[in-house]
Amino acid sequence: MVMEKYLLELGEDQVVDISDYTFAANFIWLGNVSGFYATIEDCFCLFAMSGSELSMLLPPLGKLKNLKKAINKCFEIMNSNNSSPHYSRIDYVAQCILEKFAKMLDKDASIFDVFADFIFEKKLVDYIYKADDLISLHGNAYHTKRTEINKFTNTYPNFKIVTLEPEKHAQEIITLSNTWVQNRLKYTPKEQMDDFMEGMYQEKAAIKRMLEYYQKLELMGIVLYIDERLQGYTVGEKINEGVASVLLEKTNFEVLGCAQFIFREFSKILSSQYSCEFINVGDDMGFENLKKVKMSYHPYRLNTKYSIYQKI
């Protein structure tokens, strides 16, 4: 695929393990976004249109030596289209790409030195864990997780995990997802409601797109049944040779321990199938409760993602 080709041109020593840098992730999550890609300075450049304003969903991907020239040209394109340069930005910029480019120019340079004409806004981080930690849950740090899983298996001995098959499970997955949103609305603070609903609108579209293109995107997923009723599902993919990612996960949060159990079991499957050392569960979308859950699994590292604006 075109995007993967340009990712490889970053170089073998520049492995990007952020969840946004795969075709599948962009395809399912951006199904409702108008946009286009272009080759600029021999880089893959992905643009999105919101209303009449143009922005970029990823930084230019390709040979690092072309990065800054491509960024400058992309801002020229956005500025010529937008009603104000303030709307022009590049999202989901991996810190590691910027740092590698800066060091290529000067081993002592920082990204802020090299990109002095730009404003960097730290937006989100990807949570990355050691697969073995998520599988073994060893030590006091994971005591609560082990307890929750034990309660689940003792309370629901009739659970069953099977491979996700969209033609069999699609309607049950959509029903569970809708129920999850309805239940979560009861606990969402009013000041977060607009952001929550926007996030859920995007996720609903992503779930439908995932189910429709599951096979073509070569995704992997499992569903969890209790007494013949679907109570959870999760879907992931391989990012690179060392890292797999979890793209989507939903469980009935009235079934205690269900989320912890399916996450551990899926971690086993991802590790076995892809021989990966790390598992990336994406970012927290800016939701504090999701941040707490992801931090409770003690990430091995947090990969920073920036939005970049041009100084005006």
Question: Would you name each region that the model predicts?
Answer:
Residues 218-311:
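Aromatic (often tryptophan-rich) hydrophobic motifs at membrane interfaces
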Residues 9-19, 179-188:
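Helix-loop element at the rim of GNAT/NAT acetyltransferase active sites that forms part
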